[in-house]
Amino acid sequence: MIVVSDTTPLRHLIAIGEAELLPKLYGTAIVPGAVWAELQAEATPLIVKTWLGSPPGWLEVRSSHAVVSNEPALDALDPGEREAIQLASELSANLLLMDDREGRLFALRRQLPVTGTLGVLERADVVGLLSDLP
């Protein structure tokens, strides 16, 4: 299964200690270079930066081969969202992980299957990967 992730779902899953759901559900997760850069930004929470210090083998950073877009709607997105959509399109990804509403709408118009952080958690719960909360 080919899964491409934008910044926010990965950052949220790391922050709540549930990043390991990604390989359990999907195998490898691919992030474009812009997402990797966003994850390393100064404002990124320390827990995420620490996790990125020793990234797991299931997380793969790949560059998009897309040239500059001539689509104003795509250009309006931030670099991570833009590259995640472009990479998901190039790879014919089975799933794009994205929380941003505008990015999700654009991806859906491109007929890319999209889910967000809550969708990942819901799927994990359905297949029994989450323990019951108190």
At which residue positions do the language-model features occur?
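Active-site-proximal, substrate-binding regions of enzyme catalytic domains
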Residues: 1-95, 101, 105-112
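Acidic, PIN/NYN-like endoribonuclease modules and their adjacent C-terminal/linker elements
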Residues: 43-45, 104-134
